[in-house]
Amino acid sequence: PEGREGSISTVPGSYGAWIQTPEDELEMARQLGAVAAEFARIEADFGRRLHLGLEPEPDCFLETTAQTLAFFQGSLEQGAVPEIRRILRCSQEQALFFLRRHVGVCFDTCHVALQYENPAEALQSYRNAGVLISKIQISAALRSPASKEGLEALSAFREPVYLHQVKGLGSDQRIHSWPDLPEALSEIPATAGIQELRIHFHVPLFVSPASPLTSTADTLDDSFWREVRNGACSHLEIETYTFDVLPKEVHPGDIIESIVSEYAWVLGKI
């Protein structure tokens, strides 16, 4: 609508293992530059601002806040700015302006929690670096101790529809990674020193899974909501999409009532 912005979330460049060379990074950046140029044309012609948000995700090219900031301050500018200049016939300064106005980050709180990052601090890092927060996706990951009881409880969440990357925090504070839940369940008993597991399985924000499982909804603390209220981003999206694959032990029941409950939870925080 007139007077509003449009945010579009997208993959963070690529699945991580597919990017092998600096040229691969520059090719992604050039493509993003072409998007920024097209969005600049749309805004000039129709007065409607659109922006694209790259969504860091476990095992993807961009996983962590630090990796994302490095890309935005390095390869993205190197590849995208010349492409914008070529398409729009504009100056270096104008091209950089269009890039920063139309390409940013989709901040998924489930994904941030999986990296054992503090959501409020991550938001502040992007804002301090001048990176646009295109959209905040409010979501929670599944959390479990790396105990026999925890692994048994997690077995109910094995399903073939979605990829459920797993991150484990070691006693040495090192983060261990598994590409999907079945691999994690088979390998963790042989991996010493894992204290906690976080699983890329979106669970409803208002639901507390049965012990010993919990969720990362508690990482969305007062400092995070203060950043939201202070204007970190105007687009918030509740992103629980797993109702069709949730085990019955944690499924909240009626879908419509569940969506209502999620809105009530978020609005209560705001």
PLM features: residue spans?
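Active-site acidic/histidine proton-transfer and metal-coordination neighborhood
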Residues: 1-104, 114
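Hydrophobic residues within beta-strands of alpha/beta enzymes
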Residues: 6-8, 136, 236
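Active-site-proximal loop/turn and secondary-structure-junction residues that shape catalytic pockets
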Residues: 12-17, 56-60, 109-113, 140-144, ...
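Flexible, glycine- and charge-enriched loops at secondary-structure boundaries
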Residues: 22-29, 61, 213-214, 252, ...
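Alpha-helical scaffolding segments of alpha/beta enzyme cores, especially the outer helices
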Residues: 27-41, 66-74, 121-128, 222, ...
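Active-site capping/gating regions of soluble enzymes
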Residues: 68-72, 79, 92-231, 249
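Conserved active-site loop/cleft motifs that coordinate metal ions or position small ligands
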Residues: 200, 233-241
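Aromatic-rich peripheral "rim/lid" segments of glycoside hydrolase catalytic domains that contact
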Residues: 223, 242-270
